[in-house]
A protein has these predicted regions:
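Transmembrane beta-barrel wall of Gram-negative outer-membrane proteins
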Residues: 25-102, 113, 166-169
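Short loop/turn motifs that connect adjacent beta-strands in outer-membrane beta-barrel proteins
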Residues: 45-46, 85, 179, 258-264, ...
Length: 796
């Protein structure tokens, strides 16, 4: 790269680096998963009960000691017939979770640094670990201010979450008279969550944004001039306790009546739901031993440090700068409460089991919207006709044929609390104000309010049929659907330059527009007893979808999203396009020589080996910031998804496998850093090195280049076929088990996520995102794990 730009060779003796560091190979490891379950049940004519439990342990595939998940569950079900008409049922589940985490995905994660760190840098620096480096090599500033040694980050990461959760249900049903029943059901969930995190004194190299300490020219900690110790810029301890309580109380009346061949049922009900949250947060600077075992709030204090920092000005003169660090312990609380009130009714009718009709309406009120928009009405109707019950239908090969259709509207309010009202937030770095020479904590504006927020609605029309053939061995189900989402709830990714993300704020939630999905769902299943000992069952599911944005509720007609490089976006929610469509520059190969550059439309800064961009509007100039030269580059929504399963049983042996395929979805490589000495994708091994060497991958360069503008060069076909599961089991014959008083013993081996066939160069072609307008943008997504399981099921 340096030679290509006319510079000196940076590493004359590259053999001195040995084999280098394969960061990804060093980071990933095999991790065990263990799962133990038990269950017991019993009862009498009036009482039934069951108890079950499980112990689950899983270690992370990166740094198992810092990334793991442990869960214990206990479950109990109880049913009692109090009288002939009054019945009681209860359910109680206790869950205990202990989880440790590292930064797992996206920018700032261990994996992101592992993908981009130079292979010329070793993991360790050869020191005893007592100095600022803690024994880990520095990643040079030439690799950017944010790229750090991923193993150093792991060493300095301490996050622990402990959860105790109780989930339960109590239900009473009473048969008032024949055909009339009243049911009242109370569901509850309570969770107590305790988080503790620790940011130790850490130095990752010159000018790194993650540094919590500074060092002098001798690579030693800079200390307080008053003798107070090492200057701590922002390390510390955070602890918080969060309580979640939610309940739902439903009461409904159900009336059923049959006369002649008519069957009627009516249901009327009401539902009250509440979700409450209360959190207490604290943060402070640790004193005493700098360790995880000492990292508790009671070991923190306010700090005030003074130190001298020397540096060189552009002329080489020494500049002495007196610095002060003052940080007080902070505490804050958070309170959320959401409430819902619903009324609903349903009527169902069928005649002789042949003609089916159902209608339902809900009225839902939610405090997640302002007073003028809290209530939504959501009706639905459906109908069906079972032709095989008609006297005129007499086809031996067709055992069941039902045609059906439905229309309905549902509502969505999953946007969090208080999006419609402005709030203040405090006790954070953004909410500090200077009074004289002292910085004081206060409050700052939180997420911007949108008082006009309203329900997102999903209107769906379905037409389909269900059919069974050849003595019910062959089943086919097909649906054609049109789903229209109006007032789509979305948080736009707004640039901080616009001010909405400054000072601790965030972009408001908006009703962004209208999208439409239409497609086909097809399910085909076949089962057959091939012989007395051999049984086969297989199935195929196919789903197609065409997504289109019908309306965007702003003047521009689009909302940008997705992260790429520095300040660039990848995707758009734009009228006429699928949601999350990738939008950028189109490419037309690589400039092979100066003559090609001269013959092409004017492209600023172009050199042989650079990407040749398409002049979209044909005006003779490729304008990098112009709408006219941008185009649709793909979208993350698959044209088709397929699922396949196969089950075989032969005597005591059983075999099962399932496959999943996604066809037509694209993804963006947005996990690369375009810096001189950072790691590069393997595709750069086939880069342009001279005329005729490559027409797909540009030259390597240390200088600023337009090759790193977002274009279709970074968009890949992410279609894939995944072997999701393969399992082989053996059940010991019952004749053998009778001798040892057992009902069933099955031993099995299984593999999950066995292999993925794909051309995508990232870890996982199935790139997800909570924001649908930024789906398919791979920021360094954590890979799916492959698991191998050996298990045994025992029943007494």
């Amino acid at each position: 790269t340096e030679i290509a730009d006319g510079n000196n060779i940076p590493y004359p003796n590259i053999n001195g680096f040995g084999t280098g560091t394969d960061w990804q190979k060093k980071l990933f490891t095999q991790a065990p998963i263990t799962n133990y379950t038990f269950s017991a049940s019993g009862g009498s004519e009036t009482i039934t009960h069951s108890t079950s439990g499980s112990i689950f342990k899983q270690e992370g595939i990166i740094s198992p000691e810092k990334s793991n998940f442990n869960r214990i569950t206990l479950r109990n079900n109880l049913g009692i017939d109090l009288t002939d008409k009054l019945k009681l049922s209860t359910f109680l589940l206790y869950t205990n979770i202990n989880r440790k985490t590292i930064p797992e995905g996206g920018r700032g994660s261990v994996l992101y640094y592992g993908l981009n760190a130079s292979p010329l840098t070793p993991i360790f620096d050869g020191t005893d670990g007592s100095g600022p480096s803690r024994g880990y090599s520095y990643i040079g500033s030439e690799q950017g201010i944010e790229i750090i040694n991923p193993f150093a980050l792991i060493n300095n990461t301490y996050n622990e979450t402990k959860v105790n959760r109780f989930t339960g249900k109590v239900e009473l049903s009473y048969e008032v008279i024949e055909d009339l029943k009243i049911t009242s059901r109370y569901n509850f969930n309570y969770a107590d969550v305790a988080n503790r995190n620790y940011n130790p004194l850490a130095y990752y190299g010159p000018n790194k944004v993650n540094n919590s300490v500074n060092v002098d020219d001798n690579n030693q900690f800079i200390r307080d001039t008053n003798g107070n110790g090492i200057i701590d810029l922002f390390s510390g301890v955070g602890e918080d306790t969060q309580n979640y309580t939610d309940y739902t109380w439903e009461t409904f009346i159900d009336y059923k009546k049959s006369f002649d061949n008519h069957n009627l049922s009516f249901l009327l009900g009401t539902s009250i739901r509440s979700e409450q949250f209360y959190g207490v947060y604290g943060y402070g600077s640790l004193v005493g031993e700098d360790s995880w075992s000492n990292a508790y709030l009671f070991n923190t204090q306010d700090i005030y440090d003074e130190y001298i920092l020397t540096s060189l000005d552009p002329d080489g003169n020494i500049v002495v700068d007196n610095k002060t660090v003052q940080r007080n312990r902070s505490a804050s609380t958070g309170v959320n409460e959401d409430r819902w009130f619903s009324l609903f009714g349903r009527v169902q009718y069928d005649y002789d089991g042949k003609y089916l009709f159902s209608a339902m309406v809900r009225r839902d009120a939610s405090t997640r919207f302002g007073p003028n928009n809290r209530t939504g009405y959501f009706p639905s109707v459906s109908g069906g006709w079972i032709l095989t019950k008609e006297d005129f239908f007499d086809v031996d090969q067709i055992n069941n044929l039902k045609v059906r259709g439905s229309w309905g509207i549902t509502g969505n309010d999953k946007i969090g609390s208080y999006g419609w009202i402005g709030r203040l937030q405090g006790a954070n770095a953004e909410a500090t104000y200077p009074f004289g020479n002292v910085l004081s904590y206060g409050n700052a504006l939180g997420q911007l309010a949108n008082p006009d927020l309203q329900w997102e609605t999903n209107e769906q029309i379905n037409f389909g049929f269900d059919a069974s053939f050849f003595n019910n061995q062959f089943d086919v189900t097909m649906d054609y659907y049109v789903k229209t989402t109006r007032n789509l709830l979305l948080v736009p990714e707004v640039s901080g330059l616009l001010g909405s993300t400054a000072g601790g704020s965030a972009a408001p939630i908006v009703n962004a527009g209208t999208i439409e999905n239409r497609g086909l769902d097809l399910s085909i299943n076949y089962k057959k007893q091939l012989s007395e000992d051999f049984r086969l069952a297989t199935g195929l599911n196919i789903t197609t979808v065409k997504n289109k944005t019908l309306e965007v509720n702003n003047a521009a007609g689009f909302i940008p999203s997705g992260q790429f490089g520095l300040g660039q976006t990848t995707s758009r929610f734009q009228t006429g396009l699928p949601i999350g469509s990738f939008y950028g520059l189109q490419t037309d190969g690589i400039f092979q020589n100066q003559a090609e550059i001269d013959a092409h439309a004017s492209q600023s800064g172009a050199q042989p080996g650079d990407i040749r961009f398409v002049d979209g509007d044909g005006d003779g100039v490729v304008e990098f910031g112009s709408e006219d030269d941008l185009a649709v580059l793909g979208n993350p929504i698959p044209d088709m998804t397929l699922g396949f399963n196969l089950n075989l049983d032969y005597k005591g042996l059983d075999f099962a496998t399932s496959l999943y395929a996604s066809i037509g979805n694209d993804a963006v490589r947005s996990y690369e850093r375009f810096l001189t000495y950072s790691n590069k994708s393997r595709l750069y091994l086939d880069r342009w090195t001279g005329e005729g060497t490559s027409n797909t991958t540009p030259r390597a360069s240390t200088n600023a280049s337009n090759n790193y503008l977002f274009s279709d060069f970074f968009v890949e076909d992410a279609s894939f076929l995944r072997i999701q599961n393969v399992q082989l089991g053996y059940s010991i014959p019952s004749s053998t088990l009778e001798k040892i008083k057992m009902d069933k013993v099955r031993i099995y081996v299984a593999a999950n996520n066995l292999y993925t066939f794909t051309k995508y160069s990232g870890y996982n072609p199935d790139v997800s995102n909570a924001n649908p307008s930024a789906a398919g943008v791979d920021l360094g997504q954590y890979p799916q794990t492959r698991t191998y399981t050996l298990g045994i099921n025992v029943s007494f």
